[in-house]
A protein has these predicted regions:
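Short glycine/proline- and aromatic-enriched beta-strand/turn motifs that initiate or cap beta-hairpins
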Residues: 21-90, 268-270
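Short loop/turn motifs that connect adjacent beta-strands in outer-membrane beta-barrel proteins
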Residues: 21-31, 66-74, 111-121, 165-172, ...
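Residues that define the transmembrane beta-barrel architecture of outer-membrane proteins
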Residues: 31, 52-60, 72, 82, ...
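Transmembrane beta-strands of outer-membrane beta-barrel pores
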Residues: 39-45, 78-86, 111, 127-133, ...
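Extracellular loop and loop/strand-boundary signature of outer-membrane beta-barrel proteins
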Residues: 43-52, 85-97, 139-149, 188-204, ...
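Outer-membrane pore/translocation modules
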Residues: 83-159, 252
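Detector for outer-membrane/organellar transmembrane beta-barrel domains
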Residues: 129-201
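Predominantly the C-terminal beta-signal and adjacent terminal strand-loop region
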Residues: 196-271
Length: 271
């Protein structure tokens, strides 16, 4: 038994103390892939109209990272979320198919700090695109007709990842992010509510998003909470002339200020 221990020690010394290194988790950004599953609660509000949409959501996401070896890295991630929503406003409406996807390309840089136990700060930025489809067309409980709506955001993510060792095999990764809205495009299919109404496209130029997540990683698995928030201001106004019973009317439509919050739990596998 003693000879086996001596032999193992010699092998470690010959390999340049790699035995000790193998048991220690790496906190710098690494090349690899991650698949994730999320379960969350979602709420969308238009305060001025007292409109609210609530939904439990299930999502899947993928992230691919390439580290260049000189502290720079690039990352691409994609996320798809689906759920069944409830509308409260002009009456109520349930079991609304509700989904969105989010695509992003990012570039960042690792700053390593050996003091305070050792940690990495990795600021990043890039470009993001979010598409949401609200399949709400149909009558509400009050008899009012609702309509389908799609939402497009092009945004600039600016954030930082904080990564630290918990012990030799576990680490904690926390991400803080601010999303600057470059342009939002809202398409409202008003013709579903009434045949004399036109479909309307509105543009949004003022708004922002916030993201916070914290993932505890052990081996290839990680788990943790996340929160996403959007705050979007009034869109531009679009005016159309509509004809009802032979009479012409001017219809001005805009997308009201709104906010969205989603909070949930994520489980991920890295490979």
């Amino acid at each position: 038994m003693r000879k086996s221990k001596v032999l193992a020690l010699l092998l470690c010394l010959i390999s340049g103390y790699s035995c000790a290194q193998d048991s220690s988790v790496t906190i710098t950004t690494q090349t690899g892939n991650t698949l994730g599953l999320t379960i969350s609660g979602y709420q969308y509000k238009e305060p001025s109209l007292d409109v609210k949409i609530d939904a439990p959501l299930v999502g899947v996401d993928y992230a691919g990272t390439y580290a260049f070896g000189n502290d720079w890295f690039v990352k691409a991630d994609a996320r798809y979320v689906y759920g069944s929503a409830k509308y409260t406003g002009s009456g109520t409406q349930s079991n609304i198919p509700y989904s969105y996807y989010d695509l992003r390309g990012l570039v960042g840089y690792d700053f390593s700090f050996s003091k305070l136990g050792g940690f990495v700060l990795a600021p990043f930025t890039g470009i993001g695109y979010r598409y949401l489809f609200d399949n709400q067309g149909g009558p509400t409980s009050s008899g009012a007709n609702s309509y389908n709506r799609s939402s497009n955001y092009v945004y600039l993510p600016i954030g930082v990842t904080h990564r630290m060792k918990v012990n030799d095999t576990h680490k904690l990764e926390t991400v803080f992010e601010y999303d600057y809205l470059i342009q939002g495009t809202q398409v409202s299919h008003l013709s579903q509510a009434a045949p004399y109404l036109p479909d309307v496209t509105n543009q949004q130029f003022r708004g922002y998003g916030l993201r916070l997540s914290s993932m505890y990683q052990f081996s290839e698995w990680s788990v943790g909470p996340y929160v996403t928030y959007w705050n979007i201001q009034n869109s531009n106004a679009v005016t159309n002339v509509i004809t009802v019973n032979g009479n012409n009317y001017r219809l001005t439509a805009y997308e009201p200020a709104n906010n969205t919050i989603e909070a949930g739990i994520k489980v991920a596998y890295s490979f």
